[in-house]
Amino acid sequence: MLLQNIPAIAVVLKDKDVLSIPKEELKGADLIELRVDMFEKTENISDIFETAKRKYNLPLLCTIRLPEEGGKREIKNRVEIYQAVIPFCNFFDIEIFSNEAPFLRQLSIKNNITLIGSYHNFINTPSMEQLEEVFDRGKTMGMDIIKIATMVNEKKDIETLLYFTLRHKLDRIIVLGMGQKGIPSRIINPVFGSMITYASLNEISAPGQIHLKDMVHIFKVMGLRG
């Protein structure tokens, strides 16, 4: 894994962002998540990844989110796209409960790519027992990092996610709450073991996402950056 800082800040970009946003605007980012389901086009997709790699000189995470877990549109040839961008990627993200997850696990091992097994719940934050079941499934599948993102509707949801983070602080996890009420978790959880927090530049990819400049400033104030 090629992250210089942990916790790391991942900035989320689309294809048009790669073509238009200068390197200077990504100052403070440790990782770029390219959200293919948010791309305007998926033809010649490897060109976008190659450009991002050369232009920004940061590790790349390829994510092609399913609509049922927050994807903006359905991408039917997900496996083919993952295979096409292997030369440029350091990380893949795949839903733990997706049909392609076992194949992506083997593909990642073969190509020395860190695989993030993710779970997104846009309705609520499940119980601790249910979160543990998701975590156990991810571990059983051999995911390198397990990401859990849930909708925060009340204060106790923040507490549940923080407790889960503390419980697994020695594991490789990403834990965050979505929605306006989930914003504190994007700031607090990285202090206690969540490896990556996600930030936006223009369009947010999940409710409650914080702008990159604000997240970098927050990390500096909290002593997570020099």
Curated annotation (Swiss-Prot):
Catalytic activity: 3-dehydroquinate = 3-dehydroshikimate + H2O
InterPro entries associated with the record: 3-dehydroquinate_DH_AS, Aldolase_TIM, DHquinase_I, Type-I_3-dehydroquinase
Active-site residue numbers: 120 (proton donor/acceptor), 147 (schiff-base intermediate with substrate)
Record-linked Gene3D superfamilies: Aldolase class I
Pfam families: DHquinase_I
GO biological process: 3,4-dihydroxybenzoate biosynthetic process; amino acid biosynthetic process; aromatic amino acid family biosynthetic process; chorismate biosynthetic process
Stored PANTHER family: 3-DEHYDROQUINATE DEHYDRATASE (PTHR43699:SF1)
Name recorded for this polypeptide: 3-dehydroquinate dehydratase
Gene name per UniProt: aroD
